[in-house]
């Protein structure tokens, strides 16, 4: 819905160039149609992640952009991947209870949190990095600490260079430790590139649905909760649950 009027209208109101957003989406739509897998970013992503899950047990797919501006994009991907691929039945109606678990992260913040788990925890994850490779508005670290040997080497670099070095180092560390990862590189982060990313991930989800043999366009798993909510709120035609207490409940009382 992000590229439909539901998403485009509020984006335009907030100052986003909707035409550029759609232009980027159209660009991704074109190259994601090619039958040559090596030239189809969406198809390649879906295939690699499905193989990692089905053959290697890597059921957790981590999207980790190295940009604070893409933090919300990670959460958008989490919603897209989860609601589209987590299904009880395959296309033939067989009970399968399948689907990968998406996990949002952001660099460099999660290098000092989740990467510990990615490096040394269960071999059940694939990390998908998003790297900004072009020239961005950047800040030079500066040489005002040149007299301090432990940080003097940073004087000729920028914060962007430092972040990118940390991203490349993290990817290499994961690789050396046998942890699967892939990287999408974008030159800049603007409306056109964002539209391209939205479309690329959306098409990858459709391809993944075919590989998992599920319908990625329905969301039956959320319907029961909606209907029970209607019943609890008194909507006509809907009944509240017979019991409202959870199986286990802890109550924290004020002292």
List where the protein language model places each region.
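Short alpha-helices
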Residues: 1-26, 161, 165-168, 179-227
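Glycine- and acidic
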Residues: 29-32, 58-66, 95-100, 149-156, ...
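Extended, charge-enriched "interface" segments that sit outside catalytic cores
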Residues: 143-154, 211, 242-255
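N-proximal short alpha-helices
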Residues: 43-46, 50, 54, 143, ...
């Amino acid at each position: 819905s992000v590229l439909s009027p539901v998403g485009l209208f509020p984006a335009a109101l907030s100052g986003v160039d909707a035409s550029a957003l759609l232009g980027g989406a159209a660009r991704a739509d074109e190259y994601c149609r090619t039958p040559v897998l090596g030239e189809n970013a969406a198809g390649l992503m879906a295939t690699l992640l499905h193989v990692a899950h089905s053959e290697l047990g890597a059921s957790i797919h981590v999207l980790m952009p190295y940009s604070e501006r893409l933090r919300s994009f990670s959460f958008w991907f989490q919603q897209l991947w989860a609601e589209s691929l987590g299904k009880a039945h395959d296309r033939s109606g067989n009970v399968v209870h399948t689907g990968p678990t998406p996990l949002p992260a952001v660099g460099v913040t999660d290098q000092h949190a989740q990467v510990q788990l990615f490096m040394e925890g269960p071999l059940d994850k694939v990390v998908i990095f998003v790297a900004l490779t072009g020239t961005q508005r950047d800040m030079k670290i500066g040489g005002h600490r040149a007299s301090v040997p432990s940080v003097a080497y940073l004087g000729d670099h920028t914060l962007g260079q430092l972040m990118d070095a940390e991203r490349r180092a993290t990817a290499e560390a994961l690789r050396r430790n046998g942890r699967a990862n892939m990287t999408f590189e974008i030159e800049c982060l603007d409306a056109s590139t964002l539209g391209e990313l939205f479309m690329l991930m959306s098409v990858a989800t459709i391809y993944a649905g075919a590989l998992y043999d599920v319908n990625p366009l329905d969301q039956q798993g959320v319907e029961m909760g909606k209907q029970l909510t209607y019943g609890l709120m008194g909507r006509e035609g809907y009944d509240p649950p017979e019991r409202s207490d959870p199986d286990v409940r802890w109550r924290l009382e004020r002292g």
